[in-house]
């Protein structure tokens, strides 16, 4: 199957410039292309992964990727479909974020093997060398204000206000495409569908300044069940950095996707063949309660981002927590699996009697409720059911001398730390 057809079949092409011309270029030989990543945080997230994996698919088809990290544009801020002006970050902060993002990209694209090995570029390298006057003369004169105002990302901000800084962002992104074309022969840019206006600024600059044709492919913005896209600004980001979103949390995210999304996400986020995914679909629809699609999706993406060992650890944490086998997990694994649950720092003066502690730690609201829960067998300490009202926590309950896990009922966890 032609790579363009595969991208379409996987639902990875939202919009493109001249499809026939782009398809022909991809058929005739190796195409150099790029995707840009602005350092707006110290990590990329699942919203970025769609474009990254699309880039990797093209690389596997023999084409050459350039990963552009926006050391310059990250200092400015992209206004695309944001309700308010982005906060400007210090140069030092952005430089740190650039390094973090470069490290993540290095694990998802092949930067070492073959004639089409990926290359990393930073647009600060060329923006730091051009003066404001030269930029206005050599770049700005090719863009009319009417053209810039016509962009949807700008229109949506006119009423509430947009700074010249953000207004000029599209020209900067256009200049990135121009520079990469001149230096590396790049003729294709890949990005999210909210970037269409900025991306076509690049094809416009290529056409007007160099009389060359550039192409654009936008990938769809992936939304959650409520219709929100995955992103930092939206507050529902699943980060690629394990310190921000643990492999276990990422595993749980994929395990909890809706049935209607599971097969679609297999096409977008995994490298399983379309034939394999079709077979999974048939089995999944025959027995949706077994959640086969979600299990395979979680396995494939966690392994892709964090590695096989992290996947096996996430799977083990899931199985042990489900069974209530707290003592089968290390404190490191427990911290990963129980991150985000209520946490209470035990004080030296605290009464460690189970009834008093349940109230002090906020597990229940009253001693009466605590006594009822204990007597009814609803309270567990490190997986062991406690029904003795006089039970008092001891050093034996401190796992690795760091924490104790309290469970109320089947699923409500609380962590005591020392």
Curated annotation (Swiss-Prot):
SMART domains: S4. It is an enzyme of class 6 (ligase). One of its GO terms (molecular function) is tyrosine-tRNA ligase activity. A motif ('KMSKS' region) lies at residues 229-233. GO terms for cellular component: cytosol. ATP binds at residue 232. Keywords: Aminoacyl-tRNA synthetase, ATP-binding, Cytoplasm, Ligase, Nucleotide-binding, Protein biosynthesis, RNA-binding. L-tyrosine binds at residues 34, 169, 173. GO terms for biological process: tyrosyl-tRNA aminoacylation. PROSITE patterns: AA_TRNA_LIGASE_I (PS00178), S4 (PS50889). InterPro entries: aa-tRNA-synth_I_CS (IPR001412), aa-tRNA-synth_Ic (IPR002305), Rossmann-like_a/b/a_fold (IPR014729), S4_RNA-bd (IPR002942), S4_RNA-bd_sf (IPR036986), SYY-like_C (IPR054608), Tyr-tRNA-ligase (IPR002307), Tyr-tRNA-ligase_bac-type (IPR024088). Homodimer. PANTHER family: TYROSINE--TRNA LIGASE, MITOCHONDRIAL, TYROSYL-TRNA SYNTHETASE. Belongs to the class-I aminoacyl-tRNA synthetase family. TyrS type 1 subfamily. Catalyzes the attachment of tyrosine to tRNA(Tyr) in a two-step reaction: tyrosine is first activated by ATP to form Tyr-AMP and then transferred to the acceptor end of tRNA(Tyr). This is Tyrosine--tRNA ligase. It comes from Streptococcus gordonii (strain Challis / ATCC 35105 / BCRC 15272 / CH1 / DL1 / V288). The lineage of its organism: Bacteria, Bacillati, Bacillota, Bacilli, Lactobacillales.
């Amino acid at each position: 199957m032609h790579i363009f057809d595969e991208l379409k079949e996987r639902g990875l092409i939202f919009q493109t410039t001249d499809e026939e011309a782009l398809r022909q270029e991809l058929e005739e030989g190796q195409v150099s292309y790029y995707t840009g990543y602005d350092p707006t945080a110290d990590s990329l997230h699942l919203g970025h992964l769609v474009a990254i994996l699309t880039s990797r698919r093209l690389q596997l088809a023999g084409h050459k990727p350039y990963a552009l990290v926006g050391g310059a544009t990250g200092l400015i801020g992209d206004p695309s479909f944001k309700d308010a002006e982005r906060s400007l970050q210090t140069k030092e902060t952005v430089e740190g974020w650039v390094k973090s993002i470069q490290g993540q990209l290095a694990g998802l694209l092949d930067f070492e093997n073959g004639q089409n090995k990926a290359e990393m570029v930073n647009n600060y390298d060329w923006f730091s060398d051009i003066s404001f006057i030269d930029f206005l003369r050599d770049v700005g004169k090719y863009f009319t204000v009417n053209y810039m105002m016509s962009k949807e990302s700008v229109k949506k901000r006119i009423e509430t206000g947009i700074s010249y800084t953000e207004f000029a962002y599209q020209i900067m992104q256009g200049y990135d495409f121009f520079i990469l074309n001149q230096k590396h022969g790049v003729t294709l840019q890949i990005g999210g569908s909210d970037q269409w206006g900025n991306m076509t600024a690049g094809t416009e600059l290529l056409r007007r300044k160099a009389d060359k044709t550039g192409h654009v492919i936008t990938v769809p913005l992936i939304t959650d069940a409520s219709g929100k896209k995955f992103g930092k600004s939206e507050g529902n980001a699943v980060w690629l950095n394990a310190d921000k979103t643990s492999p276990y949390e990422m595993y749980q995210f994929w395990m909890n996707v809706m049935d209607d999304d599971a097969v679609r996400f297999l096409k977008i986020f995994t490298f399983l063949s379309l034939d394999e995914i079709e077979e999974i679909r048939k089995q999944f629809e025959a027995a949706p309660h077994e959640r086969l699609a979600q299990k395979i999706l979680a396995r494939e993406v966690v392994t892709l981002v964090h590695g096989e060992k992290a996947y096996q650890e996430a799977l083990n944490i899931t199985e042990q927590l489900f069974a209530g086998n707290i003592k089968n997990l290390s404190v490191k694994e427990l911290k990963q699996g129980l991150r985000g649950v209520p946490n209470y720092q035990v004080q030296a003066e605290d009464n460690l009697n189970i009834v008093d502690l349940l109230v002090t730690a906020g597990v229940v609201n009253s001693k009466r409720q605590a006594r009822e829960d204990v007597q009814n067998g609803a309270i567990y300490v490190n997986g062991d059911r406690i029904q003795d009202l006089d039970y008092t926590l001891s050093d034996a309950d401190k796992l690795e001398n760091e924490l104790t896990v309290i469970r109320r009922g089947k699923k409500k966890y609380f962590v005591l730390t020392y």
